[in-house]
């Protein structure tokens, strides 16, 4: 029962990790279904069911895999350790913000089971999501699921902000705090500011569907484009919410593996804050095709390109950290290097898409799918694997099998590239997103992509095997490498005590 009412940040972080990993398996299964459908021409199921799977895949991966693992799992576990706090600021609220997630997930699963399921895409645009096109309760259940997940995130965000601002050890100033803690801080501010807008938009959609209002119905003087503006005002900060903790983890692991402080720490902090602020003023680049004014499109093109500058600062700072260092090529370092390379590639396709004139042609094609999967599937997910490999000894006191972990990286690296690189070609050839069938001219790249997807499932299974093997063989961490400069290793015994590091303070030299 202690897991149900535990208020210890380590227990709650572990719960988040387990929940996120489990949902990650569900999301991976859904993605395999998508790729099996597209692996051959002809259809396995009908178009609506295909769209239900696509929608569920997106929601599960974003709200129930990446966010719980990165912010809930690594955030809860590491932030108190890194700032020298005994626990989070509001431990019971922390417990509640986790236990809101399983009901949210159950609601999402139920939404695909009632009527025909919610086949709207993750953006839930009206009029497709209106009562006219989706008459059953499925979209309503999906909306309630999002409400619960959003409440969970907002409670967690308040908790992290108060913890980081008020519970640092004496002498632990904000300049000394790890970049991972900074990334969580920026992320939770984004969550706190953007989620209420999403909640407003989907509540308006709920009343449109059930109470005959017409916020998004032109027949009653509403405008479906209003929904798009509200949704993307949340949706764009959301993609930075997914990647910023990854940035922090990469900086943290890189600093430890290169045995020195990350290059340009202050610049890194300012870059993250800039990305956070700019993320709020570029939302309409998702809507270049809705008939906006040319001046508006020019502004959003320029603003989107400016985000590339702080992102570039981060990439070059990572490269400068590696440059001239004696890097320890551990499994977590492999993931970090893979992250830097593939995230940069995804960023380059993002620059292409930020041009409104090009985006008119590429909008809703597989080029966009390839872009955001390079950033998420090889950015966020690679960062999660890097963090898991790096912090596994802190969380369990055991060590993973190093050679197997490296082999798993190689398999995964080949698999995800094989899955998503061909999709750039499909997009340039004009294959649209969210369709379950396609002309035979697209067959070759789709088949290659589906083989890659199958291979990535094997990579995930290999990961499960590695974790299982680590618990089975019980290789304890005997001593901590003296070159690991960061706070969470300083206790010297793992996992750390129930309330560790209560009496530690920092001396200015």
Curated annotation (Swiss-Prot):
Gene: COI
PANTHER family (alphabetical): CYTOCHROME C OXIDASE SUBUNIT 1 (PTHR10422:SF18)
Names of required cofactors: heme; Cu cation
The keyword Ribosomal protein belongs to this UniProt entry's keyword annotation: no
Species annotation: Albinaria caerulea (Land snail)
Keywords linked to the UniProt accession: Calcium, Copper, Electron transport, Heme, Iron, Magnesium, Membrane, Metal-binding, Mitochondrion, Mitochondrion inner membrane, Respiratory chain, Translocase, Transmembrane, Transmembrane helix, Transport
Protein name: Cytochrome c oxidase subunit 1
Entry EC no(s): 7.1.1.9
Pfam families in UniProt: COX1
Positions contributing to Ca(2+) binding: 37, 42
Chain sites annotated for binding Cu cation: 236, 285-286
InterPro entries for the chain: Cyt_c_oxase-like_su1_dom, Cyt_c_oxase-like_su1_sf, Cyt_C_Oxase_1, Cyt_c_Oxase_su1_BS, Cyt_c_oxase_su1_dom
Primary residence: mitochondrion
GO cellular component term of the entry, any: respiratory chain complex IV
GO molecular function, one term: metal ion binding
Residues annotated to bind O2: 240
Quaternary structure (record): Component of the cytochrome c oxidase (complex IV, CIV), a multisubunit enzyme composed of a catalytic core of 3 subunits and several supernumerary subunits. The complex exists as a monomer or a dimer and forms supercomplexes (SCs) in the inner mitochondrial membrane with ubiquinol-cytochrome c oxidoreductase (cytochrome b-c1 complex, complex III, CIII).
Origin organism lineage: Eukaryota, Metazoa, Spiralia, Lophotrochozoa, Mollusca
Pathway the protein contributes to: Energy metabolism; oxidative phosphorylation
Family membership: Belongs to the heme-copper respiratory oxidase family.
Binding sites annotated in the UniProt record for Fe(II)-heme a: 57, 373
């Amino acid at each position: 029962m202690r897991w149900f009412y535990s208020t210890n940040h380590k227990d709650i972080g572990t719960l988040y990790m387990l929940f996120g990993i489990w949902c990650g398996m569900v999301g991976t299964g859904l993605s395999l279904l998508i790729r099996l459908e597209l692996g051959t021409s002809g259809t396995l199921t009908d178009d609506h069911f295909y769209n239900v799977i696509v929608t569920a895949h997106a929601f599960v991966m974003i709200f129930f895999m990446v966010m719980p693992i990165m912010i809930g799992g690594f955030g809860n576990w590491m932030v108190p350790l890194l700032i020298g706090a005994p626990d989070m600021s509001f431990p019971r609220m922390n417990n509640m913000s986790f236990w809101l997630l399983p009901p949210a997930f159950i609601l999402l699963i139920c939404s695909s089971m009632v009527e025909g399921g919610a086949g709207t895409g993750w953006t839930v645009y009206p009029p497709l999501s209106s009562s006219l096109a989706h008459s059953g309760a499925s979209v309503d259940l999906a909306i309630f699921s999002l409400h619960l997940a959003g409440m969970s995130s907002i409670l967690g965000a308040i908790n992290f902000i108060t913890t980081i601002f008020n519970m640092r050890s004496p002498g632990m100033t904000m300049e000394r705090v790890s970049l991972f803690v900074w990334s969580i801080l920026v992320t939770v501010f984004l969550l706190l500011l953007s989620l209420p807008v999403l909640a407003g938009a989907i509540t308006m959609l709920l009343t449109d569907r059930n109470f005959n209002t017409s916020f998004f119905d032109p027949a009653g003087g509403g405008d479906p484009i209003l929904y798009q503006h509200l949704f993307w005002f949340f949706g764009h900060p959301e993609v930075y919410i997914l990647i910023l903790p990854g940035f922090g983890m990469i900086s943290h692991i890189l600093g430890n593996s290169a045995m020195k402080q990350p290059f340009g720490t202050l610049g890194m902090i300012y870059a993250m804050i800039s990305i956070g602020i700019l993320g709020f003023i570029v939302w309409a680049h998702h809507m270049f095709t809705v008939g906006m004014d040319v001046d508006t499109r020019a502004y959003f093109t320029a603003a989107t390109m400016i985000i590339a500058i702080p992102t570039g600062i981060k990439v070059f700072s990572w490269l400068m950290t590696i440059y001239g260092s004696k890097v320890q090529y551990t499994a977590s370092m492999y993931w970090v290097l893979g992250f830097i390379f593939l995230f940069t590639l995804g960023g380059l396709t993002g620059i292409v898409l930020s041009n409104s004139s090009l985006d008119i042609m590429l909008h809703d094609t597989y080029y966009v799918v390839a872009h955001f999967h390079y950033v998420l599937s090889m950015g966020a997910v690679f960062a999660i694997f890097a963090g898991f490999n790096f912090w596994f000894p802190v969380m369990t006191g055991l060590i993973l099998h190093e050679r197997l972990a490296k082999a798993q990286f190689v398999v995964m690296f080949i698999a995800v590239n094989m899955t998503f690189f061909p999709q750039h070609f499909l997009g340039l050839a004009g294959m649209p997103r969210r369709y379950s069938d396609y002309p035979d001219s697209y067959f070759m790249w789709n088949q290659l992509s589906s083989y890659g997807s199958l291979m990535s499932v094997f990579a995930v299974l290999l990961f499960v095997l590695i974790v299982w093997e680590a618990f089975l063989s019980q290789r304890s961490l005997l001593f901590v490498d003296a070159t690991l400069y960061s706070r969470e290793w300083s206790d010297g015994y793992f996992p750390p005590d129930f309330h560790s590091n209560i009496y530690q303070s920092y001396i200015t030299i």
